[in-house]
Amino acid sequence: MKTLTLVAPAKINFYLEILGDRPDGFHELAMVMQSIALGDRLHLRQRQGQGFQLGCDRADLEVDERNLILKAAQRLQRSFPQIGGVDFFLEKRIPIGAGLAGGSTDGAAALVGLDIFSGLGLTQPELEAIAAELGSDMPFCVAGGTQLCTSRGEQLTPLPPLPSLSLVLAKFESLSVSTPWAYGRYREQFGDRYLQTEPARRDRLQALHAGPLLQAMSAGDPVAIAQHLRNDLEAVVLPEYPQVAELRSVLGNCSGILAAQMSGSGPSVFGIAENPTAAQAAVEQVRQAIADPDLKLWVTQTISHGIQTETLLR
């Protein structure tokens, strides 16, 4: 039986600015997304007949039609009926409901995996276009690396690869934040600040292109990068979830941590560390400051790629 294993990296947001409303109900965004080494593994195995089945090593993850792996497989098969039956098995390592694109990267891995498995020969832009139908951050997960993401997040502009940055990632395991709630609350509280015209939004994007964050990233300067992080959703999530605010503060004040910020709509928080030793020391400092068994911490790093093939057996 033919098998394939892929690694699906998580992402963090170095930058998330909400520019305004879109006619389709989404928000117009300007984001800098970054792939990190923490990732899931998706195994594909050829099966007799048609159809797809999904298993997972986490009992608390849906493995039915709601899962983006199956949604992605079914969407691709509608365009390419020659795709045969496949059994998927997911080794879940990215925390669930964390603002790290765990579901989207798994769906992206399904698209990439089926393309390889079935010999479709799709280009990356073709895969990204299909991914955009399934989720706003799924095109980024296909591409990976360091990207400026605009529109609702699906329009990608590659940025120069970063040197490997050491990171600490932290999340209360049982806590999740609804992404629609976070954006809806932001609209309620700050909608009067939205840019109302296309020229105004275009000018804002041009300013971001020429601004200090992208300059720091081009220079590979972690200290300067840390000085220019931004996540607009912190303004609504942190007051509503004080434990996330405390976690962000504690991590950000650890020795050797240059800055800390929430990723996406949360509740995960990441810190940029001076080096791997400082990252590991920060983990111990956070554990001492917040003695909660529900708090999970990881030491990881930035990477320059998206979905990658690990093994292919024929």
Curated annotation (Swiss-Prot):
Pfam families: GHMP_kinases_C, GHMP_kinases_N
Catalytic activity: 4-CDP-2-C-methyl-D-erythritol + ATP = 4-CDP-2-C-methyl-D-erythritol 2-phosphate + ADP + H(+)
Residues annotated as catalytic: K11, D137
The protein's Enzyme Commission number: 2.7.1.148
EC class: transferase
Keyword tRNA processing: no
GO biological-process terms attached to the record: isopentenyl diphosphate biosynthetic process, methylerythritol 4-phosphate pathway; terpenoid biosynthetic process
Membrane-traversing stretches: none
UniProt pathway: Isoprenoid biosynthesis; isopentenyl diphosphate biosynthesis via DXP pathway; isopentenyl diphosphate from 1-deoxy-D-xylulose 5-phosphate: step 3/6
Keyword line: ATP-binding, Isoprene biosynthesis, Kinase, Nucleotide-binding, Transferase
Annotated positions binding ATP: P95, I96, G97, A98, G99, L100, A101, G102, G103, S104, T105
Gene Ontology MF, one: ATP binding
Domain of life: Bacteria
Statement: the UniProt record of this protein carries the keyword Protein transport: no
Family to which the UniProt record says this protein belongs: Belongs to the GHMP kinase family. IspE subfamily.
Functional summary from the UniProt entry: Catalyzes the phosphorylation of the position 2 hydroxy group of 4-diphosphocytidyl-2C-methyl-D-erythritol.
Name of this protein: 4-diphosphocytidyl-2-C-methyl-D-erythritol kinase
Natural source organism: Synechococcus elongatus (strain ATCC 33912 / PCC 7942 / FACHB-805) (Anacystis nidulans R2)
